[in-house]
């Protein structure tokens, strides 16, 4: 694991692990991610980080919240395609199918530390830059 990746994962895991826990059954968070076949984009590096960080989060509710929230942009708001040989990434940044440069960049920022080992993620980010 690369240093930046490890630092980001460790910081996030510590933050979530130290947060107050709740054991109330009615507060349980279910997996809200779309089925794999219905996700807009899947990154092997993101999925691996979710597994690693989830092991460090003791509170089940916080663990499931992380598992649902961290990949949400890739799961639901990214539209990726190739225009010829050029990648093209559209990121829905609101309640309508519109893309704002600042917002779309901010939505993909948490995944930048994972790019080095994930060619598909690199191509997705290149598509955003091309936009």
Name what the model sees in each region:
Residues 1-10:
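Bacterial N-terminal signal peptides that target proteins for export
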Residues 21-24:
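Sec/Tat signal peptide C-region and signal peptidase I cleavage site
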Residues 26-99:
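Low-complexity, Ser/Thr/Pro/Gly-enriched N-terminal "stalk/linker" regions
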């Amino acid at each position: 694991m690369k240093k930046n990746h490890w630092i980001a994962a460790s910081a996030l895991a510590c933050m979530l692990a130290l947060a107050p826990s709740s054991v109330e059954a009615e507060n349980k968070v279910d997996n809200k991610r779309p089925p794999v076949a219905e996700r807009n984009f899947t990154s092997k590096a993101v999925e691996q980080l979710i597994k690693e960080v989830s092991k460090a989060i003791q509170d089940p509710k916080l663990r499931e919240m992380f598992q649902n929230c961290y990949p949400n942009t890739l799961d639901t708001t990214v539209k990726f395609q190739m225009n010829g040989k050029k990648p093209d990434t559209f990121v829905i940044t609101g309640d309508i199918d519109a893309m704002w440069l600042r917002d779309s960049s901010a939505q993909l920022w948490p995944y930048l530390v994972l790019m080095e080992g994930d060619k598909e993620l690199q191509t997705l980010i290149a598509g955003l830059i091309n936009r």
